[in-house]
Amino acid sequence: MATWGLLLRAGPRLLRERRARISHCLLRRTFFGFPRTKAGSAVTQQGDVCLRLCSPRSSTTATSAAGEDAWLKWGLLLVPLTAFCLGTWQIQRRKWKLDLIAQLASRLSSEPIPLTLDPMELKELEYRPVKVRGHFDHSKELYILPRSLVDPEREAREAGKLTSHAENGANVITPFYCTELGVTILVNRGFVPKKKLKPETRLKGQIEEEIDLTGVVRLSEKRKPFVPENNIEKNRWHYRDLEAMAKVTGAEPIFIDADFRSTVPGGPIGGQTRVSLRNEHMQYIVTWYGLCAATSFLWYRKFIQKIPL
């Protein structure tokens, strides 16, 4: 009974204090933002608004929305930052690739060394000039096709042109017995046009005597996408598979490209080595930095200038 009496005495006082706080809030909102009606009862009209504004639930919702906006803002900033880092990484990759191409070009122009039969050493000698002495076995020719003639002078003249007039044909691969080493290797003698593919059409170039030969070491190739499989039965090869070529000819899986000085009248044109390393890093640099610039601009408009996208 004492408790009920206390509540009855305190209840009216608590109710008056609650009404005073609500009235004060309503009057404040009316003065700063909500016009009074002609009847002057802005308190009545804005009561539901003020209650919502003053409620703890509204404050929690606003805080949650602000937190979500912050996460979105800084999360989206990762997009241009990541693109910038990838573009910078591609600059380093391009520098590394250009240095590698320069090293290979320098290796091609170095003095030839005697050919080694050590497989581990051969792996380190790709594009390195070597010299051998021996003779060809023209009865076991192989053909890598289609191929176009590697002609640096023609390529320099046609640089920038939309069309090219390179002649199509094949590279002739011939077993070569090395008299000093006592083994047979594979030699890419060079390019022949289609009309000279058959050996009987170039008998003058089918040299039989023992010769000194200089060429560059080449390793086995992996088949690239969209490149056909080698057709061993028809002697149509599309990439260097040294193990398969050695099995067909009985030679060792050692391959060299004969240099241009090995060319004989009526025979294949030597010097068909092309240093081909993919170097598309400039395209990637432009792509990543372009994406960085575009997304940075959109982020700035959205979160700094507050312009709807």
UniProtKB/Swiss-Prot annotation:
Keywords (A to Z) from UniProt: Membrane, Mitochondrion, Mitochondrion inner membrane, Transmembrane, Transmembrane helix
CDD domains membership: SURF1
Cellular component, GO annotation: mitochondrial inner membrane; mitochondrion
Compartmental location: Mitochondrion inner membrane
Family annotation (PROSITE patterns): SURF1
A Gene Ontology biological process term: mitochondrial cytochrome c oxidase assembly
Broad class of where this protein is predominantly found: mitochondrion
TM ranges: 71-89, 284-304
Gene Ontology terms for molecular function: cytochrome-c oxidase activity
Function in brief: May play a role in mitochondrial respiratory chain complex IV assembly. Probably involved in the biogenesis of the COX complex.
Family (UniProt): Belongs to the SURF1 family.
Name of the protein this chain belongs to: Surfeit locus protein 1
Protein species of origin: Gallus gallus
Highest classification ranks of the organism: Eukaryota, Metazoa, Chordata, Craniata, Vertebrata
Gene it is expressed from: SURF1
